Amino acid sequence: MAKMFDLRTKIMIGIGSSLLVAAMVLLSVVFCLYFKVAKALKAAKDPDAVAVKNHNPDKVCWATNSQAKATTMESCPSLQCCEGCRMHASSDSLPPCCCDINEGL
């Protein structure tokens, strides 16, 4: 019975297939990051922020679209607020401020 592939051919097929798998994984990671950044930029263009009247103009209360229509002065303290546009790196749980679309990217 004759050998179908010698050792060099098997090694070359293994290297080629591993490079193909690595390229596909890298491509999927790039697409995933692209869609995340596109979603973040789209959300930054249409911020769901409602400024509170009679308060500090630097404070912005964040709400969803349905809450933004019915937000009153009494319901605002339950929403998350941020002071100004400069936030520390330790405050990941707060929403991004709406100063610049590309800020934080």
Swiss-Prot record:
Its main location: secreted. The keyword NAD does not apply. GO terms for cellular component: extracellular region. Residues 1-32 form the signal peptide. InterPro entries: FAM24 (IPR028122). The keyword Cell cycle does not apply. It is found in: Secreted. Keywords: Secreted, Signal. Pfam families: FAM24. Belongs to the FAM24 family. This is Protein FAM24A. It comes from Homo sapiens.
